[in-house]
A protein has these predicted regions:
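Metal-dependent phosphohydrolase cores
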Residues: 1-143
Length: 143
């Protein structure tokens, strides 16, 4: 999926939130956002399954994807640092987490650190997204 298609279908409130975080959207992020690794996150809920729980306990206005969350983290970092590498680190911080990851972390006894489901990013990208891996190498960024 291309970034423009993702953005056109984005909830207007999330679009506004992105603009509040960083009035300038760093265009260098677009090829990374369009990668298989990150586009996968558009279908992974940020709420780790809580969106499907009782509406008496949770009353979310709408769902937010892990991709939305990752972009917002990158925009926060960009707004304060204007550092490409730190911004990419923020963008990719959830790249390898599976759906319901924090639920599985809890089942794994890792409810404090919530890292048991995270895979090594370099190995993940090398294996599942060689195009992105080669792009990182081409621009001289170590994962």
């Amino acid at each position: 999926m291309k970034f423009n298609e993702y953005y056109e279908n984005l909830n207007p409130e999330i679009k506004e939130y992105f603009k509040i975080i960083s009035p300038h959207f760093p265009k260098f992020l677009i090829p990374f956002i369009e990668s298989k690794t990150l586009m996968r996150l558009k279908d992974v809920s940020y709420f780790c399954g809580a969106i499907n729980a009782s509406s008496k306990v949770y009353n979310f206005k709408y769902d937010i994807s892990r991709l939305d969350h990752s972009i917002s983290c990158a925009l926060h970092v960009w707004n304060f640092t204007y550092n490409d590498i730190l911004t990419l680190a923020a963008l990719f911080h959830d790249a390898t987490t599976p759906a319901l990851s924090h639920v599985v972390d809890y089942l794994n006894g890792d409810y404090l650190n919530q890292e048991s489901t995270e895979l090594n990013l370099e190995e993940y990208v090398k294996t599942y997204d060689p195009e992105l891996f080669n792009y990182f190498k081409r621009i001289g960024v170590n994962i």
